[in-house]
A protein has these predicted regions:
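Structured soluble/peripheral alpha/beta segments that form catalytic or ligand/cofactor-binding pockets
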Residues: 35
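Charged, gly/pro-rich active-site loop segments
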Residues: 54-113
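A short, polar/proline- and glycine-enriched secondary-structure boundary/capping micro-motif
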Residues: 38-44, 60, 87
């Protein structure tokens, strides 16, 4: 799990727990298009991700960057994320809802531990 920070319409931060995949030097998320975090990213793509090592809370990775959003209507990416977390993302979506793949393009990466 990671914590995603986005900025709301009023400029205040919103924090959300999200599933992620790290692959090909990228961090990608699968998000439901009806959620506030997606609306925030469409308005302001700047975001931060914090990935905390649950076995050692003094070890973490912070990524600050911009979100690039691409449609995932067939759940091709969502299914890969779901496999990592042993869950089906469709179980979290209501009928008619769709998903996007969000790639965080880093401007700054900070690690500790």
């Amino acid at each position: 799990m990671a914590t995603l920070a986005t900025l709301g319409e009023d400029g205040r931060p919103q924090l959300s727990e999200v599933w992620f995949l790290a692959e090909d030097d990228q961090v990608r998320l699968s998000l439901n298009t009806t959620r506030q975090k997606v609306r925030n990213l469409r308005r302001r793509p700047g975001c931060s991700l914090l990935i905390l090592d649950l076995a050692n809370p003094y070890r973490y990775l912070e990524i600050r960057g911009d979100a690039e959003i691409t449609p995932d209507p067939d759940y091709l990416f969502a299914d890969r994320v779901g496999a990592k977390y042993q869950a089906d993302p469709r179980d979290m979506d209501q009928p008619g809802e769709t998903r996007v793949a969000v790639t965080v393009r880093p401007h700054r990466i900070r690690a500790w531990g």
